[in-house]
Curated annotation (Swiss-Prot):
Stretches the record annotates as G5: 551-553
Lineage: Bacteria, Pseudomonadati, Pseudomonadota, Gammaproteobacteria, Vibrionales
Protein known as: Translation initiation factor IF-2
Residues given in the record as GTP binding sites: 415-422, 461-465, 515-518
Chain residue ranges for the region called G1: 415-422
Composition bias, Basic residues: 299-308
Keyword check for Manganese: no
Purpose: One of the essential components for the initiation of protein synthesis. Protects formylmethionyl-tRNA from spontaneous hydrolysis and promotes its binding to the 30S ribosomal subunits. Also involved in the hydrolysis of GTP during the formation of the 70S ribosomal complex.
A GO cellular-component term linked to this record: cytosol
Gene for this chain: infB
Disulphide bond pairs: none
Localization (cell): Cytoplasm
Length: 907
């Protein structure tokens, strides 16, 4: 390790010894000129010097930055004799910027030290005052004790000696007067002392307050200076492009030296350029003074125009740095609005979306998810706005703070089509609802409640056809117990498996009713084995599911099924709030021609009364009338009771929640908000076009479309039929539901069908008189159905008629060339023997040589014994002339075929 003296170090670095000693002292090292300096001390000195000069290249954090600036300009002065000359003027400026944190730390440290010193002085003064008070109190006690002792001794002497009483009394009075004067003097001294202490304390507090204010003022000045410096640094950083004539010197910084060299080089290049003319100098002088500048055109040019003086031109440039901010995004947003929130141009947003694979325009509505991805891609923080505050406020304003009471179970009857679900329910209700359903199959959700000896049960009867998947799912979601009806002769079928999946997804217990046990081919054990494959295990096998063998036709074990249902409900301990505002679910809805929108609502909690204001999805209204499943008028309905309500503004969607609210105006606002949000979200999803789908969309132009206007009696049927028809679409024919709704067929539907070249399908509905006239006038295809099987089959037939036909080539004859003749009219004539089938005139043919097709064309001439014939059968000779072909050789085969059109169907 090499060590030098301070003097040697000063000679080595070229610094005076006194200056070096001062720098060492500032760095915390007191040295003399003859002391040794180690490498660690050198490093410490270097770090201190870097810190003093604001160098950030080392480990020390810079605290100061010194900038030098030179500005050159040209001034035109009068040189006498009417001449002027240009004088170069150079202005040099030097500024030192101190880092904000260092100033704040120093001010804070000074304030802390001052506060500590004041606290120590205050503690010291308090200790001195306490000691002084103790000394004074001790002196006072000693004086009192001494006076007391003297008085006692005097009294004792008076009693003992019995001397002259007058002299003693006089002495006593003198002593008392002296003691009194001493006490008064002490009181005066104590008051003076306290007054002096109070004055001193006030002076100290005033000094302390002034010191704190001075410290705070210095701190604020330092903070303001730091903020100003920060703004200047930011401005200098942003305006780097305007610094060609500016020279910055940052000491001990490599990057600063490089910038300095670059600036000098540019300055030298500028100096070599041609000097400005006198007119340009005057123009620049006018610009500096804010005077007008006139640009005059040449000969024949336009007149000059006054340009704005420099003082009137704005000096603000658009920031090149994109401001990162929080972007609030709602359910949907327009592309231009999203760009405004991010403070960028809409074209930038569209570019980002195109890179992400989404095509959009400036006025297009995009959904929340897409907008969030775009904003995060551009570096912004996204805040998703909750727009349903009014909805939550309306739904939370309810008076359901009542005690829950036991309620009846809601049981859903599910199973495969024609397994006896409705028949089982019929026997329970002692009615014949199945005969009222077209084709004997259930096509709606029937909601009924029945009274048994052990209690009330509410039943939901769901369709078993494959088209009614959504209706079965809704039935499972709104239920407490699922009764799975399985025919003992058929076993497990596709809709049986689907019902099991719905029940498991809803998390409700499953009771299996094995029906049709009265049939000879019934096999209940086989049903158990098949259901065990889907984790439906009977209790006797150690499972959790109860099995009941019933016969809906004869009523066997129906009572046992009801007891099993009530037993399962008792285990579940089903409760609900009976009083208060009602809430439930829309099981089914339809548009009645005489009564308007009708919704079947299953009340789940509270009591629904006539006159209540009900909010159902996008619809609302006051309950004008309520009917039970039989059709009787009722005034109220409690939990687990299904009722039909009238008075809604429109037909609600099946599965919507029905809630009683207080204010009709707020209910209307919530319904309108839901409808608007539904439209916006639907539009945003429809307009979402991906780049990867562009070519498939182009190819879709060749696809035939079957447009359909669908009307049905209830909402569930519309949903089921539309879903089934949409699934019929193939690559060649697409089913397009241009319009659907609940209720009869109106003239509006006919106009829509005419405009879109569609057919009208009515399911359990009819067209009114005006609609029939419009349909006949436009020759629109109108069809009525009451069974969903027939509707789907006929739509398949219509789609089959739109398929492009297939063509098949069938070989009808084969002839062998035995000889070739020349004809002046027809050219080469092949003398042939028909070996297979028959040969027809004007039929397409192929010429085969060594079983290889060498020509395909048309048979032009067919003769037998110089007579033209239409056809020649197998085993006969004939002459064949091939159209536009003369290279027929002996041994060739002529194959005759015909093209057959094959009719295609939709499977």
């Amino acid at each position: 390790m090499t060590q030098l003296t301070v003097k040697a170090l000063s000679e080595e670095i070229g610094t005076p010894v006194d200056r070096l000693l001062e720098q060492l002292a500032d760095a915390g090292m007191k040295k003399s000129s003859s002391d040794q300096v180690s490498d660690e001390e050198k490093q410490k000195l270097l770090t201190h010097l870097k810190k003093e000069h604001g160098d950030t290249s080392g480990d020390a954090e810079p605290t100061r930055l010194t900038l030098q600036r030179k500005t050159r300009s040209t001034l035109s002065v009068n040189a006498g004799g009417g001449k002027s000359k240009d004088v170069q003027i150079e202005v040099r400026k030097k500024r030192t910027y101190v880092k904000r944190s260092a100033i704040e730390d120093e001010a804070k440290r000074e304030a802390e030290e001052a506060a500590q010193r004041e606290a120590e002085e205050a503690a010291k003064r308090a200790a001195e005052e306490a000691a002084k008070r103790e000394a004074e109190e001790a002196a006072k006690r000693e004086a009192e004790e001494k006076a007391k002792r003297e008085a006692e001794e005097a009294a004792k002497r008076e009693a003992e000696k019995s001397v002259d009483r007058d002299a003693e009394e006089k002495a006593k009075r003198d002593a008392e007067g002296k003691a009194k004067r001493d006490a008064e003097e002490k009181v005066k001294q104590e008051a003076a002392r306290k007054e002096a202490e109070e004055l001193k304390r006030r002076q100290e507090e005033e000094a302390k307050r002034k010191a704190e204010e001075e410290s705070q003022r210095k701190l604020e000045e330092a903070r303001e200076m730091a903020e100003k410096n920060k703004e200047r640094w930011s401005a200098a950083e942003e305006n780097k492009g305007d610094m060609e004539d500016t020279d910055y010197h940052v000491t001990t910084s490599q990057y600063a030296r490089e910038a300095e060299d670059e600036a000098d080089r540019k300055e030298e290049e500028a100096r070599r350029r041609k000097k400005k003319t006198k007119s340009s100098a005057k123009a620049s002088e006018n610009d500096e003074r804010g005077g007008p500048r006139v640009q005059r055109g040449g000969k024949g040019g336009r007149k000059g125009k006054l340009s704005k003086p420099k003082s009137m031109q704005h000096g603000f440039d658009k920031s090149a740095v994109v401001a990162k901010s929080d972007v609030v995004i709602g359910e949907t947003i327009v592309v231009s609005e999203l760009a405004n929130k991010m403070s960028v141009k809409a074209t930038e947003v569209i570019k980002i979306m195109m890179k992400m694979g989404a095509m959009a325009t400036i006025n297009q509505v995009i959904d929340q998810e897409t907008a969030q991805l775009v904003a995060e891609e551009m570096g912004h923080k996204v805040v998703l706005r909750k727009e349903n505050e009014l909805e939550e406020a309306v739904l939370s304003d309810r008076d359901n703070m009542f005690e829950a009471v036991p309620r009846a179970p809601v049981v859903t009857i599910m199973g495969h089509v024609d397994h006896g679900k409705t028949s089982t329910l019929d026997y329970i209700r002692r009615t014949h609802v199945a005969s009222g359903e077209a084709g004997g199959i259930t096509q709606h959700i029937g909601a009924y409640h029945v009274e048994t000896e052990n209690g009330m049960i509410t039943f939901l009867d769901t369709p078993g056809h494959a088209a009614f998947t959504a209706m079965r799912a809704r039935g499972a979601q709104a239920t407490d117990i699922v009764v799975l009806v399985v025919a003992a002769d058929d076993g497990v079928m596709p809709q049986t498996v689907e019902a099991i999946q719905h029940a498991k997804a809803a998390g409700v217990p499953l009771i299996v009713a094995v029906n049709k046990i009265d049939k000879e081919e019934a096999n209940p054990d086989n049903v158990k084995n098949e259901l065990s494959q889907y984790n439906v295990m009977p209790e006797e096998w150690g499972g959790e599911n109860m099995f009941v063998h019933i016969s809906a036709k004869q009523g066997t074990n129906i009572d046992q099924l009801l007891e099993t249902i009530l037993l399962q409900a008792e285990v579940l301990e089903l409760t609900a709030v009976k009083d208060g505002m009602a809430s439930g679910v829309v099981v089914e809805s339809r548009l009645d021609k005489g009564r308007g929108p009708v919704a079947t609502v299953l009340v789940q909690s509270g009591t629904l009364r006539k006159g209540d204001i009900v909010l159902c999805g996008q619809e609302y209204g006051r309950v004008r009338a309520m009917r039970d499943e039989i059709g009787n008028e009722v005034n109220e309905a409690g939990p687990s009771i299904p009722v039909e309500i009238l008075g809604l503004s429109g037909v609600p969607a099946a599965g919507d929640e029905a809630t009683v609210v207080r204010d009709e105006r707020k209910a209307r606002e919530v319904a309108n908000y839901r409808a608007g949000k539904f439209r916006e979200v639907k539009l945003a999803r429809q307009q979402k076009s991906k780049l990867e789908n562009m070519f498939s969309n182009m190819a879709a132009g060749d696809v035939a479309e079957l447009n359909i206007v669908l009307k049905a009696d209830v909402q569930g049927s519309v949903e089921a039929i539309a879903d089934s028809l949409t699934k019929l679409s193939t690559e060649e024919v697409k089913v397009n539901i241009v319009g659907s709704g609940v209720g009869g067929i109106t003239e509006t539907d006919a106009v829509l069908a005419e405009a879109s070249n569609a057919i009208i399908l009515g399911f359990n509905v009819r067209a009114d008189a005006s609609a029939r006239r419009a349909i006949e006038a436009a020759s629109i295809d109108l069809r009525y159905y009451s069974i969903i099987y027939q509707l789907i089959d006929e739509v398949k037939q219509a789609m089959s008629g739109m398929l492009a036909p297939e063509f098949k080539q069938e070989i009808i004859g084969l002839a062998e060339v035995r000889d070739v003749f020349k004809s002046p009219k027809l050219g080469a004539i092949a003398g042939c023997m028909v070996t297979e089938g028959l040969i027809k005139r004007n039929a397409p043919i192929r010429v085969l040589r060594d079983n290889v097709v060498i020509y395909e064309g048309e048979l032009e001439s067919l003769r037998r014994f110089k007579d033209d014939v239409a056809e020649v059968k197998n085993g006969y000779e004939c002459g064949i002339g091939v159209k536009n072909y003369n290279d027929v050789r002996v041994g060739d085969q002529i194959e005759v075929f015909e093209t057959i059109e094959i009719k295609r169907t939709i499977d």
